[in-house]
């Protein structure tokens, strides 16, 4: 989903100054993450603001959303995208390193976190900052979330499958519990390449799920349409 902009049913994303563009991974995460009962939400590494905007669309007027981002160009673009949306009064964009960010506790934290490993060559410095695990590794992400969540709060993430397995192992060792795991296949019959994770600090049995995005003929699958139709301008089975 490259290009300089992306239009959804209720909001528009400009992304010409953001290193990481709107992708299916964020759209799936923003559609899948449970928001019931959440009064305060934190988006870690907001980028264009896509996840903050999706959750604003899905939640009641009194829900407050903080969107934290380190890159100054992404912060400016996220602010512009949010200010042009119907939810500008509910979303606050904050330029800060999440590792030292302080705020009242959140009921829900959502993130499409860094997932490139050390040694990978990336096109430019901004993209490297946005996606290099040296900037926010899994340990730092989990520690930040644990510090900022309420006791019953939840952490929702999307990662490539292998990185997701690594994070679950790390989280389990650190006292987290995996509530839900959804393996995502881009096309029917292909091996999953993404995983959606919902973690909490309270004991829970893991719900295992599977999501297919497209059929073999490249049409959106019925389950993906049911999940994301409130956002996409055009989806048809």
Curated annotation (Swiss-Prot):
PROSITE patterns: N6_MTASE. It catalyses: adenosine(37) in tRNA1(Val) + S-adenosyl-L-methionine = N(6)-methyladenosine(37) in tRNA1(Val) + S-adenosyl-L-homocysteine + H(+). GO terms for biological process: methylation; tRNA processing. Pfam families: MTS. It is an enzyme of class 2 (transferase). Its EC number is 2.1.1.223. GO terms for molecular function: nucleic acid binding; tRNA (adenine-N6)-methyltransferase activity. Specifically methylates the adenine in position 37 of tRNA(1)(Val) (anticodon cmo5UAC). This is tRNA1(Val) (adenine(37)-N6)-methyltransferase. It comes from Tolumonas auensis (strain DSM 9187 / NBRC 110442 / TA 4). The lineage of its organism: Bacteria, Pseudomonadati, Pseudomonadota, Gammaproteobacteria, Aeromonadales.
